[in-house]
């Protein structure tokens, strides 16, 4: 069915869609009539042929009868019975023939006369059920919406048989469907029904809400998986209805032996409009057995028409549909409606206003199957959630598509300003980028410019002539079938050109977009040719549907969507304004020529000229106005009345400067008037006029005007008239460019010390527009920056969305905060990647690998922080999908560890040391690089580590110290992925290799002391050119040293301190670790010292949650590895990049450290009585203090035996750390005696949490402090709760309202 439109308004588009549905209903009725005439068996019914002929005219009466038959056929399915009753007396007015048997009214033995129950017209149905069941029915009938209480559990009075009663109201009473309650079902009461549905659907809903935004395909795949798990059907599919009402299978999960239907397209008649209407009212449709004989209804003869079964759960399938199911081997089905918002202005009725049927989720089974009503209610609830999630995805996709179109329009407009009109077809992007199409053309001045797949130039001219002849009254035309639009030359265009959108830009010029026929885009995995297939397309079957669909869409393109037509219309307006310049110029030339000929003699001649001038002014395509010597309007043509919304009669005698001009243009207009009245005419001056009437909500009207003097017969100036050009649309787009350029200029020129380095490049890759943060970096060639530019472009789009469109839960300040952090990440990426490319081109330049590593680490940390925040805080918001489109951490990680980049680094390092030539290193890396090129599935990180690993082995035994230093540094960073290699040299754990360690130790330079503890001292040092921390243990065979080295060697996490190496020199055990800025306790102390109010806490609540969240993530990683820390406290938590200012909020990087007392959970070694409970009493769990041990049942016993350390003791310590971060003080600060602290802990005493602690956090800490370790949450649970709390704080839904962190440095 073709869709041909002559206008682009949304209302007309909605009406057109309504017309399509009406026409489709007619086609449904025609197809049904053909089926009915084929006989009961339907053997003579040719499905494929009938679909093609169903569009023929059908009498209105036949359509009405068809719709009535669909709703009032008087047949139900036999897995239940139906009774219709009057209100309020419950007298039966209709019932199904099987009702007596189903309700156990037919006794097994002959009853006495007093015991016989009778069901007939007029029977009070309450007498057939127990008193409690009757009361339940009466209570349900008294409610306004009876369906909210479904199912109502009732029991037959005679047998006590339990039944589900599903009730709904119709025009003449209440229809009650009765279904059997199976023994495996768990009957739920009316009050508990909704709650039970929520519980059963909870897992599926959680999974749906956790999906990333913007991926409709993944969302559909997930819903079919969850529905199949709930219902157990053989096949579950998700159908989507397209704009032309045809359907497509977009997701499928099936039994392996069933034929796939994924990708199947089927004609709109396969699911009639009447069935779709019924699904909007009754959103879950069950067919238990398509072969079962339907049951007839018996109704009161006084009722004038059959009882409506539109809302009945038992309505029988129509014969045509039942045969279709049987042909495809689907005996039973469960169909669920997927309904989303419909923003179209035009609607068919109140029931459907604002909502539309997006598609269906369809379950099919190869044998009879009945799903109990409570489970169907669960599915219906799940579909509601799915519809809400889908609506968010659809709206996001529409926003992104509109944003892309707007950006393209902006660029096209800019091209017009520079090269009109040819720039929109000769430059990039062009008009093909505006909407999805296969080709486009510009027909202007009888010349043709072609792009992509289009008709020939002569055919374009013929189409233009046809439009001017048959559609000259419209501004454009869109159709998915030129043949159906009655274009006579359509058969000459072939399959390559079927659909067309045309926009008239002048009286005789057009823009065209073309599309090929739909079949070129349609693929179905099941549509394979089978020589043995006997189905010739006559019978109803998915294969026949697919064939019929291809026949229907033959010579037809995909339809033009409203958003695409809006984009075309917008461009049309811009172009018409641009082309109007020529007409305006002609008008101005004509007017000036007439004015210069005022030397004409004779009154009659002058009057004729005046009349002609009035006609020219009134009919001119340009806005024209005139004023007298006082500035009062005395001429106001139709065009300016149109653009301002002010009618001529209201404009006359208004003051131009006081009533019509915006304040910002008053001075300009007054100057123009003054000069013109003195005889001096100005040209090309911009003025802004007010808007009136229906135009008041729009922007000001911007005109470029020429001021012309109006003279009388004596040649005196008596007034001024203005000939203008409307440039409002162009100025809107130029203002958008100006704002973007202004932001870019601020970034480049802003001298703020916190501004990150940024620069841009020209078409040759040279740097320009550097800001002060880039310092004295010289211009250099950056190599290929296409990927980086794409990355930045995508991110800028995201930031524009965030900064300009307020979220329902995020205010503008919060969005700008996130956008600022993302911009910092991107600028760091720009610096890192461009410098790397620069050094690639200048191999002789000296390098600072430490700088590269630090920039990359900072970049990756910030990127992951933003991405993690988005995942945790924006579950159901468009903002999550918009930001995750940038794939920040994935992109940065892949670029940071790119093999090519690392290979260049090896070459530069070796060249600097002079130990190996570049050619030698190239040979070493070449094979690995070729493997990556041949097989992209190989993990680049692993390959990178392998290359370093091999190079290190080649250099350790030589005198190539510089290369060895560099390679060891890189190798230690890559070490966590190396254990997968089968062989490792002895020097790997080189703290056991004295000869090498002694040589290695010479590379460490001590620069200062950091502190000391009971088992080790920590010094500040420089190792391999990088500042590090050197931890030296007391004693030669220190168990703490070996334990810590063994644990650190297996750890790799952003919230766990990293070990570079562990050299042993002169029997001194040492660990070389990353250098941090200090511990958490010292940071809190510095914060408290700086606070003017010494009673205020050291951190804001948002910082508190961020710090303990990072700590919990590090501890969760340890526990997943089976490692117990045993000494978790603020002194053993290190921080990085801290300045002790408010601007650091959200940037405190936390890492868990000090593993000297740590132990693996599964270790068979038990601690000695002297060492097992080492730690600090204030942070010790009660079971640790009490010398408990883990029994085989997992419980803690306190009898003094030597213990295994319980895992949940770390959770208790974590609770104490939370107290520290909240208050800035140690636990139990008033108590100085350690023994008293132990006693208090064992008695269940805990520190008092401060008043500013949010309720959610207070509950979590209390759980961590629980006396019973088995009742404490795991760190995995703690992480989830803290992420959610962070979300609540950021969105303002927490019990605590903290100020949002400032991104400005305090003065």
UniProtKB/Swiss-Prot annotation:
Region (Hinge): 779-1003
Pfam families on file: GAF, PAS, PAS_2, PHY, PK_Tyr_Ser-Thr
Protein kinase domain ranges (all copies): 1004-1307
Plastid listed as a keyword: no
Enzyme Commission number(s) from the entry: 2.7.11.1
Domain GAF span(s) in chain numbering: 215-394
Function comment: Regulatory photoreceptor which exists in two forms that are reversibly interconvertible by light: the Pr form that absorbs maximally in the red region of the spectrum and the Pfr form that absorbs maximally in the far-red region. Photoconversion of Pr to Pfr induces an array of morphogenic responses, whereas reconversion of Pfr to Pr cancels the induction of those responses. Pfr controls the expression of a number of nuclear genes including those encoding the small subunit of ribulose-bisphosphate carboxylase, chlorophyll A/B binding protein, protochlorophyllide reductase, rRNA, etc.
Record's keyword terms, sorted: ATP-binding, Cell membrane, Chromophore, Kinase, Membrane, Nucleotide-binding, Photoreceptor protein, Receptor, Sensory transduction, Serine/threonine-protein kinase, Transcription, Transcription regulation, Transferase
SMART domains: GAF, PAS, S_TKc
Record organism: Ceratodon purpureus
Entry annotation: catalytic residues: 1127
Binding-site positions, phytochromobilin: 320
Gene Ontology molecular functions: ATP binding; blue light photoreceptor activity; protein serine kinase activity; protein serine/threonine kinase activity
Domain of life per record: Eukaryota
Protein known as: Light-sensor Protein kinase
Residues involved in ATP binding: 1010-1018, 1031
Domain PAC: 683-739
Gene Ontology BP term (one): detection of visible light
GO cellular component terms given for this protein: plasma membrane
């Amino acid at each position: 069915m073709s869709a041909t439109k002559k206008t682009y308004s949304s209302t007309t588009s909605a009406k057109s869609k309504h017309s399509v549905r009406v026409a489709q209903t007619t086609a449904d009725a025609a197809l049904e009539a053909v089926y009915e005439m084929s006989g009961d068996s339907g053997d003579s019914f040719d499905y494929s042929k009938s679909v093609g002929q169903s569009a023929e005219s059908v009498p209105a009466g036949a359509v009405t009868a068809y719709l009535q038959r669909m709703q009032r056929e008087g047949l139900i399915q036999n897995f239940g019975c139906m009774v219709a009753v009057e209100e309020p007396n419950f007298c039966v007015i209709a019932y199904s023939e099987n009702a007596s048997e189903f309700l156990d009214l037919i006794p097994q033995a002959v009853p006495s006369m007093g015991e016989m129950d009778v069901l007939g017209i007029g029977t009070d149905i309450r007498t057939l059920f127990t008193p409690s069941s009757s009361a339940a029915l009466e209570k349900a009938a008294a409610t306004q919406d009876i369906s909210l209480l479904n199912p109502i559990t009732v029991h037959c009075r005679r047998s006590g048989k339990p039944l589900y009663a599903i009730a709904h109201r119709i025009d003449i009473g209440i229809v009650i469907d009765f279904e059997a309650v199976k023994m495996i079902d768990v009957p739920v009461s009316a009050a508990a029904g909704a709650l039970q549905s929520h519980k059963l659907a909870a897992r599926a809903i959680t999974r749906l809400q956790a999906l990333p935004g913007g991926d409709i395909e993944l969302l559909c795949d997930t819903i079919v998986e969850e529905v199949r798990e709930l219902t157990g059907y053989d096949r579950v599919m998700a159908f989507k209805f397209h704009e032309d009402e045809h359907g497509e299978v977009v997701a499928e999960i099936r039994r392996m032996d069933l034929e796939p239907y994924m990708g199947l397209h089927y004609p709109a008649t396969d699911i009639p409009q009447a069935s779709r209407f019924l699904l909007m009212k009754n959103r879950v449709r069950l067919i238990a057995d398509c072969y079962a004989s339907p049951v007839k209804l018996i109704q009161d003869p006084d009722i004038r028409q059959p009882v409506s079964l539109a809302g009945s759960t038992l309505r029988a399938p129509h014969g045509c549909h039942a045969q279709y199911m049987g042909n495809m081997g689907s005996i039973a089905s469960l169909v669920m409606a997927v309904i989303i918002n419909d923003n179209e202005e035009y609607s068919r009725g109140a029931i459907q206003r604002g909502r539309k049927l997006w598609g269906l989720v369809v379950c099919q089974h190869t044998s009879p199957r009945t799903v109990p009503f409570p489970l169907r209610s669960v599915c219906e609830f799940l579909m509601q959630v799915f519809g809400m999630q889908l609506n968010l995805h659809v709206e996001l996709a529409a926003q992104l598509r509109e944003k892309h179109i707007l950006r393209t329009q902006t660029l096209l407009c800019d091209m017009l300003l520079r090269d009109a009109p040819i720039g929109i077809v000769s430059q990039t992007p062009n008009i093909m980028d505006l909407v999805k199409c296969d080709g486009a053309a510009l027909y202007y001045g009888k010349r043709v410019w072609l792009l992509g797949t289009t008709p020939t130039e002569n055919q374009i001219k013929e189409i233009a002539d046809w439009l001017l002849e048959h559609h000259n009254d419209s501004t454009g035309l869109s159709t998915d079938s030129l043949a159906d639009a009655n274009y006579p030359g359509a058969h000459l265009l072939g399959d390559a050109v079927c659909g067309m959108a045309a926009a008239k830009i002048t009286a005789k010029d057009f823009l065209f977009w073309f599309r090929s026929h739909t079949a070129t885009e349609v693929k179905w995995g099941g549509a394979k040719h089978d020589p043995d297939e006997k189905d010739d397309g006559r019978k109803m079957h998915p294969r026949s549907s697919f064939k019929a669909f291809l026949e229907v869409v033959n010579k037809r393109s995909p339809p033009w969507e409203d958003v695409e037509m809006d984009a075309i219309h917008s461009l049309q307006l811009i172009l018409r304004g641009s082309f109007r310049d020529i007409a305006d110029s002609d008008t101005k030339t004509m007017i000036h020529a007439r004015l210069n000929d005022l030397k004409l003699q004779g009154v009659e001649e002058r009057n004729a000229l005046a009349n002609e001038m009035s006609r020219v002014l009134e009919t001119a395509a340009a806005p024209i106005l005139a004023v007298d010597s006082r500035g009062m309007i005395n001429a106001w043509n139709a065009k300016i009345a149109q653009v301002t919304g002010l009618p001529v009669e209201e404009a006359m005698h208004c003051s131009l400067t006081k009533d019509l001009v915006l304040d910002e243009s008053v001075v300009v207009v007054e100057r123009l008037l003054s000069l013109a009245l003195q005889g001096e005419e100005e040209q090309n001056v911009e003025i802004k006029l007010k808007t009136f009437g229906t135009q008041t909500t729009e922007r000001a009207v911007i005109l470029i005007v020429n001021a012309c003097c109006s003279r009388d017969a004596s040649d005196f100036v008596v007034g001024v008239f203005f000939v203008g050009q409307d440039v409002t649309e162009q100025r809107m787009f130029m203002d958008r460019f100006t704002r973007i350029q202004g932001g870019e200029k601020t970034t480049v020129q802003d001298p703020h010390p916190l501004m990150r380095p940024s620069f841009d490049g020209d078409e040759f890759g040279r740097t320009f527009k550097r800001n002060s943060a880039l310092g004295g970096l010289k211009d250099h060639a950056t190599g290929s920056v296409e990927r980086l530019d794409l990355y930045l472009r995508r991110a800028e789009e995201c930031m524009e969305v965030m900064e300009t469109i307020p979220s329902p839960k995020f205010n503008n300040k919060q969005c700008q905060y996130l956008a600022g952090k993302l911009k910092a990440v991107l600028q760091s990426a720009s610096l890192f990647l461009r410098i790397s490319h620069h050094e690639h081109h200048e191999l002789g330049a000296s390098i600072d690998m430490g700088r590269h590593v630090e920039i990359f680490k900072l970049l990756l940390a910030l990127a992951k922080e933003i991405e993690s925040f988005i995942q945790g805080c924006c579950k159901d918001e468009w903002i999550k999908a918009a930001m995750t489109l940038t794939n920040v951490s994935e992109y940065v990680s892949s670029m940071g560890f790119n093999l090519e980049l690392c290979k260049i680094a090896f070459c530069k390092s070796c060249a600097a040391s002079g130990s190996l030539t570049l050619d030698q290193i190239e040979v070493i890396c070449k094979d690995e690089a070729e493997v990556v090129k041949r097989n992209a599935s190989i993990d680049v990180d692993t390959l990178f580590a392998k290359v370093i690993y091999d190079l290190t082995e080649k250099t350790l035994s030589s005198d190539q110290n510089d290369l060895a230093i560099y390679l060891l540094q890189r190798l230690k960073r890559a070490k966590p992925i190396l254990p997968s290699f089968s062989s490792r040299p002895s020097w790997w754990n080189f703290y056991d290799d004295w000869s090498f360690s002694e040589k290695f130790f010479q590379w460490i330079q001590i620069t200062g002391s950091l502190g000391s503890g009971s088992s080790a001292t920590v010094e500040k040092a420089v190792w391999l050119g990088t500042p590090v921390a050197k931890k030296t243990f007391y004693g030669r065979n220190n168990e703490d040293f070996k334990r810590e080295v063994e644990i650190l060697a297996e750890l790799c996490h952003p919230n766990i301190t990293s070990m570079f190496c562990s050299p042993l020199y002169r029997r001194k055990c040492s660990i070389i670790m990353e250098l941090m800025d200090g511990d958490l306790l010292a940071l809190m102390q510095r914060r408290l010292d700086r606070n003017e109010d010494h009673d205020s806490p050291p951190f804001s609540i948002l910082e508190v949650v961020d710090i303990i969240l990072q700590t919990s993530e590090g501890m969760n990683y340890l526990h997943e590895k089976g490692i117990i820390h045993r000494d978790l406290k603020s002194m053993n938590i290190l921080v990085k990049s801290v300045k002790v200012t408010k601007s650091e909020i959200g940037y405190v990087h936390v890492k868990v450290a000090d593993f000297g007392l740590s132990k693996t959970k599964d270790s068979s070694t038990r601690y000695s009585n002297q060492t097992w409970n080492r730690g600090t009493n204030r942070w010790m769990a009660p079971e640790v203090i009490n010398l408990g041990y883990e029994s085989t049942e997992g419980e803690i016993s306190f009898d003094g035996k030597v213990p295994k350390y319980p895992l949940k003791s770390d959770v208790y310590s974590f609770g104490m750390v939370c107290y520290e971060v909240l208050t800035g003080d140690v636990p139990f600060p008033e108590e100085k005696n350690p023994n008293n602290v132990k006693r208090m802990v064992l008695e269940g005493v805990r520190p008092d949490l401060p008043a500013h602690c949010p309720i959610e956090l207070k509950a979590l800490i209390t759980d961590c402090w629980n006396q019973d370790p088995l009742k404490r949450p795991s760190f995995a649970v703690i992480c989830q709760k803290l992420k959610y709390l962070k979300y609540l704080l950021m969105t303002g839904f927490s019990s605590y309202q903290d100020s949002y962190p400032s991104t400005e440095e305090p003065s």
